[in-house]
UniProtKB/Swiss-Prot annotation:
Positions bound to 3-phosphoshikimate: 28-29, 33, 173, 175, 326, 353
Annotated Gene3D superfamilies: Enolpyruvate transferase domain
The protein, known as: 3-phosphoshikimate 1-carboxyvinyltransferase
Species name: Rhizobium johnstonii (strain DSM 114642 / LMG 32736 / 3841)
Organism classification: Bacteria, Pseudomonadati, Pseudomonadota, Alphaproteobacteria, Hyphomicrobiales
Assembly information from the UniProt record: Monomer.
Family note: Belongs to the EPSP synthase family.
Pfam families reported in the protein's UniProt record: EPSP_synthase
Amino acid sequence: MLNGSASKPATARKSAGLTGSVRIPGDKSISHRSFMIGGLASGETRITGLLEGEDVINTGRAMQAMGARIRKEGAQWVIEGTGNGALLAPDAPLDFGNAGTGVRLTMGLVGTYDFHSTFIGDASLSKRPMGRVLNPLREMGVQVSASEGDRLPVTLRGPGTPSPIRYRVPMASAQVKSAVLLAGLNTPGVTTVIEPVMTRDHTEKMLQGFGAALSVETDGDGVRTIRLEGRGKLAGQVIDVPGDPSSTAFPLVAALIVPGSDITIVNVLMNPTRTGLILTLQEMGADIEVVNARLAGGEDVADLRVRHSELKGVTVPEDRAPSMIDEYPILAVAACFAEGATVMKGLEELRVKESDRLSAVADGLKLNGVDCDEGEDFLIVRGRPDGKGLGNAADGRVSTHLDHRIAMSFLVLGLASEHAVTIDDAAMIATSFPEFMQLMTGLGAKIELVAE
């Protein structure tokens, strides 16, 4: 359930070939950062293609609460920022709902300010650990008051003068890296982040685009050193947000597993730190054609033509996990229809997502007749290319645990399974992909809400 709203069960059934051309909503990572950095920059920022899911809107509301002016003009969002270093103390707690990215990055953005700011979220977000972001802020001199286990609610109070730090990110996390860099914007001197494993680099690209003095060096081992000069001026920009690769994954995998499908997905973000899923599916034999590749706002963008394919199981390299961590649930669905076993390792990060995503996937697969093994940090799926025996003839419902990606992944599973697949709640899909149901049914997918 979302913000107290009633749950909405949904069912997906075996579908005929999916066809058509679709445009995916804007990338969630870039949308969050557009509101944050646009809200902080001097002058006007204009954004088209913004993802208008609840998570991103909550980030926008938080920026408004700290002095940014945000309005919508037609299809564009227009922001008048406060200027770097000029955020105002919020009058009330900042409520991020289900948005892990929003809350963690905003903690970095405002944590170093010399005022109190309190962060709250929904039941799911309140279970997620915040310590990985709070620890570097503590090193910068921020006073932290948090619930047990460094969970929400969290209250921060910045020092009079924050100290720049040199911080080595202890896990592959774009959120931690970004929080430290955003904290560095209001910190005198040079803030340095060392990243042993490269993660999505939208924060670095966008800060450079807004005029921050930021440099990136990569050594022979692939270790990145990012340096940011604090307290510089940021100037408003015009941003066109490309389609979200994590949302693209759902119609893309659906087309691969439903016989007779041939779809085109236009304007997809193809940043190399985000394309692990596409690479993995191609290794499995997926027919994914990248067309009209181009650069837009410093990011790689392309259209994808996707056709039904006979997939083979693979072992996914562990070092690919950071570039596709959000896509493992839908990759597991693709693996259900592949010949042989698909082995996914290095998945410990999935246990601290919107749900314990690894268990949620494994439990849902078993409920729907899939042969799989779950370990502490791995998942093995043995496929049935014909979909025979998959699904749940007894109307057993997948527990989504308030997790939008679990919900969408299992609805895709039902499109090629012998029996229907039903999930206990589709309401939270609105956090990241409000148009999901309409877009999928428009391609020919048999997905519908269940009348209770």
